[in-house]
């Protein structure tokens, strides 16, 4: 006998908003700390201002109503988008008003991009260097010029129009943020309707977004860039609306346009292969990816996401239910599997945010690697300053997101985790064997640390003793990265083997010939050797330590053998009360604090490796006699000792920033000095004792009382947690600005 299954319930999507839930009033803006009973009384001590900053955006502490918290977060997102549009508008406005974009467009290999002109106040005009084409300004390394050319922008007037459009969008975002909190605020069930959210984000944002960009690339970017590549004067190129409306004009450049949509509806899509290509490699004129490959990519991505956006069950009884998928996800050894995770992810926005930050951060680091290996925009590859800036930027952004993932995962564990709903599921099982996980991870870190540094120490010792034949190097004892070389070769051979329709490999870095643009190397095969093998294991070591610190913070955020009731103490606390020595700096917050230092450690070595490797083995000038690299291939010979890193990278390459005074790069010299100072200032907070400062403050207050000038607000030393926060902020700010000035002064001088 067959039993028909009960009819699957289909979620009926209703319009779920509350009308006018919160009146619009500016009065709260005049009451700092209005969200907290303690803070709204005003300051009695200087601790008040620190607590105000710490809690202003901690919506959890303002109310326990999940619906109101969700609305505040939703509204704040619109505010964030508004700020982003204003920033973007400012970038386009600078391109329109203060830049040499049109001159750069006419000669991108000789003229450098500039979109900032310094006003003379007391001699600052020295910063306006000669960037070519008779323009004086600061050389920029953001990549906007290359992006604008790829988009098909041919005049500064178009940049003006786009800048105004950005401000209009910003206004729309700010309005939406106000409207969806004060006028029509979504109910909690709207925020928790994950199937509808997935469908709309996948099909709308990613699917239609990619489709719109593919359409722009096909109808506007491709024809304009084809004409620019052929040397047509930007002023002679047809305007975008002409290209969109005049099919004959397009058919001259791409003959398949003459056939209209017939091949599309008869499924003969191959007819369009003149503008939807699969060439691989780089355009030899611009050193960027083929824009026709990019259009093809975005169209294919759009199709995939439009399909994906119809996967989840909403009003109709078909498609996936997220809860069913998660609860069906059981392995033979994992107990209840993912049961209970649906409830976590629909009621804890910290848990949701932790996963999204981990994914987005990892993606940002992947983007950093793709942007130099497969430069997406024309003339990006030969602009070495921009290449270095984009790599560094995406690596650091990724690192901050990943540490943020650790932070919010721990906040979820402390504030939102309910053990009763998580019995024997994967999360519970991970927490129950956390000792095994952390001790094994700790062993891995010790192993990697001693072995990777041990190889360097061996080399430094042998080098000092004058025994080069006993060193690990490409010329003595070789430690070749054979697996990486095999991966490179496999990808290089793909067009003949696994990807027969591609005309060339995805990236020139896999192998093949040098791509040179205007006498500079755009990209060439990257040979890996012993020095790369050594520093790779330093990367493995530092990344594993960062993960160890963050994961330990998450897994022990509610309890530990040392402090069994840690969950009651909250996310951040200095110590487990008086009389319990040795329990300081164990809060989940302190793990995030320590994780930030190791993230910075880890990624400094990544960007140093990239910077030196590219200058040594890739970037340089091309003449009839061959390639001359910036540092002449010294990476393989020098980067296998710690002394080599100190002498031939840090010391040798800092000469440009140290000697920049009196030149257009002098601001980088001052920044290098100032950022070192900011970094050193952080140590005052990190190595300090709170009692020392409290004692000092009280003697200073005594002096003020004597003179009858004592303040009404009593001064207090920073708490331990506040001191560490100020310390890590200045440590990272100082370190990042030091690296920024060091990199840019160097690469703008020699690149």
Curated annotation (Swiss-Prot):
Which residues are recorded as binding phylloquinone?
693
Q: Which UniProt keywords apply?
A: 4Fe-4S, Chlorophyll, Chloroplast, Chromophore, Electron transport, Iron, Iron-sulfur, Magnesium, Membrane, Metal-binding, Oxidoreductase, Photosynthesis, Photosystem I, Plastid, Thylakoid, Transmembrane, Transmembrane helix, Transport
Cysteine pairs bridged by disulfides in the record: none
For molecular function, the Gene Ontology terms on record are: 4 iron, 4 sulfur cluster binding; chlorophyll binding; electron transfer activity; magnesium ion binding; oxidoreductase activity
Q: Which Pfam families match?
A: PsaA_PsaB
Please list the residues that bind [4Fe-4S] cluster. 575, 584
Q: Where does chlorophyll a bind?
A: 684, 692
Q: Name one GO cellular component term.
A: chloroplast thylakoid membrane
Q: Where in the cell is it found?
A: Plastid, Chloroplast thylakoid membrane
- GO annotation, biological process: photosynthesis
- Is rRNA-binding tagged as a keyword? no
Give the cofactor binding note. P700 is a chlorophyll a/chlorophyll a' dimer, A0 is one or more chlorophyll a, A1 is one or both phylloquinones and FX is a shared 4Fe-4S iron-sulfur center.
Q: What is its EC number?
A: 1.97.1.12
Name the positions where chlorophyll a' binds: 676
Stored InterPro entries: PSI_PsaA (IPR006243), PSI_PsaA/B (IPR001280), PSI_PsaA/B_CS (IPR020586), PSI_PsaA/B_sf (IPR036408)
The role this protein plays is:
PsaA and PsaB bind P700, the primary electron donor of photosystem I (PSI), as well as the electron acceptors A0, A1 and FX. PSI is a plastocyanin/cytochrome c6-ferredoxin oxidoreductase, converting photonic excitation into a charge separation, which transfers an electron from the donor P700 chlorophyll pair to the spectroscopically characterized acceptors A0, A1, FX, FA and FB in turn. Oxidized P700 is reduced on the lumenal side of the thylakoid membrane by plastocyanin or cytochrome c6.
Hey, which family's this protein in?
Belongs to the PsaA/PsaB family.
Cite the record's note on assembly: The PsaA/B heterodimer binds the P700 chlorophyll special pair and subsequent electron acceptors. PSI consists of a core antenna complex that captures photons, and an electron transfer chain that converts photonic excitation into a charge separation. The eukaryotic PSI reaction center is composed of at least 11 subunits.
Q: What is this protein called?
A: Photosystem I P700 chlorophyll a apoprotein A1
């Amino acid at each position: 006998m067959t039993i028909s299954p009960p009819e699957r319930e289909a979620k009926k999507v209703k319009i779920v908003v509350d009308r006018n839930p919160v009146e619009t009033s500016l009065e709260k803006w005049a009451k700092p700390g209005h969200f907290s009973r303690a803070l709204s009384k005003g300051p009695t001590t200087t601790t008040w201002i620190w607590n105000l900053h710490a809690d202003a955006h901690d919506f959890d502490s303002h109310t326990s109503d999940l619906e109101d918290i969700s609305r505040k977060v939703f509204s704040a997102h619109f505010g964030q988008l508004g700020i982003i549009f204003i920033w973007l508008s400012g970038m386009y406005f600078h391109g329109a008003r203060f830049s040499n974009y049109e001159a750069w467009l006419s000669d991108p290999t000789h003229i450098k991009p500039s979109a900032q002109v310094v006003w003379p106040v007391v001699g600052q005009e020295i910063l306006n260097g000669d960037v070519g084409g008779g323009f004086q300004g600061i050389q920029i390394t953001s990549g906007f010029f290359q992006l604008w050319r790829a988009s098909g922008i041919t005049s500064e007037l178009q940049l003006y129009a786009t800048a105004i459009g950005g401000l209009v969008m910003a206004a729309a975002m700010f309005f939406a943020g106000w409207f969806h909190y004060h006028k029509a605020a979504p109910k909690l069930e709207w925020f928790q309707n994950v199937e509808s959210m997935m469908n709309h984000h996948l099909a709308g944002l990613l699917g239609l977004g990619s489709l719109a960009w593919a359409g722009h690339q096909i109808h506007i970017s491709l024809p304009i860039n084809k004409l620019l590549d052929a040397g047509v004067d930007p002023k002679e190129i047809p305007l975008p609306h002409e290209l969109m409306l005049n099919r004959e004009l397009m058919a001259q450049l791409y003959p398949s346009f003459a056939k209209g949509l017939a091949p599309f509806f008869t499924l003969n899509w191959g007819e369009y292969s003149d503008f939807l290509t699969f060439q691989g490699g780089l355009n030899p004129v611009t050193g960027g990816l083929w824009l026709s490959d990019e259009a093809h990519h975005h169209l294919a991505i759009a199709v995939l996401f439009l399909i994906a956006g119809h996967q989840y069950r909403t009003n109709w009884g078909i498609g996936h239910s997220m809860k069913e998928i998660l609860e069906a996800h059981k392995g033979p050894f994992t107990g209840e599997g993912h049961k209970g995770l649906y409830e976590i992810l629909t009621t804890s926005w910290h848990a949701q945010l932790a996963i999204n930050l981990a994914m987005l951060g990892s993606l940002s680091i992947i983007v950093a690697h793709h942007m130099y290996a497969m430069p997406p925009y024309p003339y990006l590859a030969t602009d070495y300053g921009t290449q270095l800036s984009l790599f560094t930027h995406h690596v650091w952004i990724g690192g901050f997101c990943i540490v943020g993932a650790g932070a919010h995962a721990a906040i979820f564990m402390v504030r939102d985790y309910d053990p009763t709903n998580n019995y024997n599921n994967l999360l519970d099982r991970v927490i129950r064997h956390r000792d095994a996980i952390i001790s094994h991870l700790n062993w891995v870190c010790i192993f990697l640390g001693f072995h990777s540094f041990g190889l360097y120490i061996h080399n430094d010792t042998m080098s000092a003793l004058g025994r080069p034949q006993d060193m690990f190097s490409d010329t003595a004892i070789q430690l070749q990265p054979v697996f990486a070389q095999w991966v490179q070769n496999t990808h290089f051979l793909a067009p003949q083997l696994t990807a027969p329709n591609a005309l060339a490999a995805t990236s020139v870095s896999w192998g093949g010939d040098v791509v040179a643009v205007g006498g500079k190397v755009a990209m060439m095969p990257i040979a890996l050797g012993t020095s790369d093998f050594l520093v790779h294991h330093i990367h493995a070591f530092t990344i594993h330590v960062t993960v160890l610190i963050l994961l330990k913070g998450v897994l022990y955020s509610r309890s530990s053998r040392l402090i069994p009731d840690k969950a009651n103490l909250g996310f951040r606390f200095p110590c487990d009360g008086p009389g319990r020595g040795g329990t300081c700096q164990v809060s989940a917050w302190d793990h995030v604090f320590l994780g930030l230092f190791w993230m910075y450690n880890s990624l400094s070595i990544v960007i140093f490796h990239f910077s030196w490797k590219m200058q040594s083995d890739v970037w340089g000038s091309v003449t009839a006699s061959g390639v001359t690299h910036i540092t002449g291939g010294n990476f393989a010979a020098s980067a296998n000792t710690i002394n080599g890193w100190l002498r031939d990278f840090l010391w040798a390459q800092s000469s440009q920033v140290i000697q920049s005074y009196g030149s257009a790069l002098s601001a980088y010299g001052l920044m290098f000095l100032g950022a070192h100072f900011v970094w050193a200032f952080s140590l005052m907070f990190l190595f300090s004792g709170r009692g020392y400062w409290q004692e000092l403050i009280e003697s200073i207050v005594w002096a003020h009382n004597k003179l009858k000038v004592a303040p009404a607000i009593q001064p207090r030393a920073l708490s331990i947690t506040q001191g560490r926060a100020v310390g890590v902020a200045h440590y990272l700010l100082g370190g990042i600005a030091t690296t920024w000035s060091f990199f840019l002064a160097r690469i703008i001088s020699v690149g």
